[in-house]
Amino acid sequence: MAHKKGTGSTRNGRDSNSKRLGVKAFGGEKVSAGSIIIRQRGTSFLPGINVGKGKDDTLFALKEGTVSFDSIKRNLRNRKRVNIIL
């Protein structure tokens, strides 16, 4: 018979690092070409004029200018779009 209580095992105790997603440059901000505007998983925001989309759905500026947000109706729902105004 044990005189000490054995330690139990648990399936918890892990946590992933934060991915630092979100808007990095807000509307009206000046950005240079190549600047990251939004880090996202999936396409919550669509790329508009002078905005490119990376393979991980990150939106970045193709040209220097000012960030602008608007919404467009697409497939019976409103989608958010990011543009760079020169």
Swiss-Prot record:
Residues 1-23 are annotated as: Disordered. Keywords: Ribonucleoprotein, Ribosomal protein. One of its GO terms (molecular function) is structural constituent of ribosome. One of its GO terms (biological process) is translation. Transmembrane segments: none annotated. SUPFAM superfamilies: Ribosomal L27 protein-like. InterPro entries: Ribosomal_bL27, Ribosomal_bL27_CS. Pfam families: Ribosomal_L27. One of its GO terms (cellular component) is cytosolic large ribosomal subunit. Belongs to the bacterial ribosomal protein bL27 family. This is Large ribosomal subunit protein bL27. It comes from Prochlorococcus marinus (strain MIT 9515). The gene is rpmA.
